[in-house]
Amino acid sequence: MPDRVLRSSKERLLSGMKGKLFLGALLLGASLVGASTTETDTVKGLADDPVLIQLDSLLFADYFLAGPDSTVEDPTVIGAGPEVSDSVIQYRLALLDEQTPLELDYNEHVARFINVYANNRRQQVSRMMGLGQLYFPLFEEVLDKYNMPLELKYLAIVESALNPRAKSRVGATGLWQFMYSTGKIYGLEVSSYVDERSDPMASTDAAARFMMKLYESFGDWNLVLAAYNSGPGNVSKAIRRSGGKRTYWEIRPWLPRETRGYVPAFIAANYIMNYAEEHEIYAQEVSVSRYDVDTIVLKRLMTFDQLSLLVQVPVGDLELLNPQYKLNIVPIIKGKSYTVTLPREKVGLFVTHEDSLYRYAEAAMPGLTLP
């Protein structure tokens, strides 16, 4: 069970922790994450950071239910979050650190990203909380299968802002941002019609196997995160250049620029997903949850438009639940079977009337073939 036994650095008692934390707060400077920090101060130098780019792309996703604003104040207003002292932030993060084999350290780099989440990107955090209700149960199931720290589920926040169809400037795709070649190595199908890098189940399983392989090489979860982002070669090179240091913070100066912000963003994501409501950020609901869905195997080629008409599920919901179908078409290919995820109550409807639904679809669009 990798890292299940807490290292000696984590065998400290919570009693007596407060004094150390307040001393650390004085060293860092009070209220690093208070509302007094402006967006210009916080995101200066982060404008082209992939984490912020993915966060901002979530504003254009249409997966969310209409309704009252999910934050107490206008999330677009800089400093809309309540002011929270640095010592409180540090103490909360230390409590989370006690509950995981990951090292959730706190410093000015982590504080910078916490401020981004808590003050400058509140609406995006609200949306990620909603998507988390759909994806986190799935992530936890897969991580538990491989006996990995469950907190690694928050890595998808840094990678894709939980947008299943996210695509980076260099072509990394999906919740876990697999490049084409890496996806193929881990068995993900990428074709003109199907991209399993965007399949929540398939890509999560592949990401877990990839991280376990990295853990076998580095034996440290923070180094695994760095290697997931920059590649194991860059981490090994940073270890050599640092004189053989073996922790993320020791080798950080020798890592690529993007990776120097990657682990701090991950630690900040752990914080904000556990303490969002203390910052008056609440989940913006999506139309479905992981516990309310099931899968079927189609026996006939069908478009999302057809399926939407037949089972009365909005196309947007079908896209959210089945992001692996690139053209919104579920293909039929000899020797392969493709599943469709639907709201659970619609699965029963489909199974009960399956043959008549196929006949209706054929009558409506006879001879439909792949484009």
Task: Identify the residue ranges that each predicted region occupies.
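Primarily a LysM-type cell-wall glycan-binding module
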Residues: 284-312, 364-371
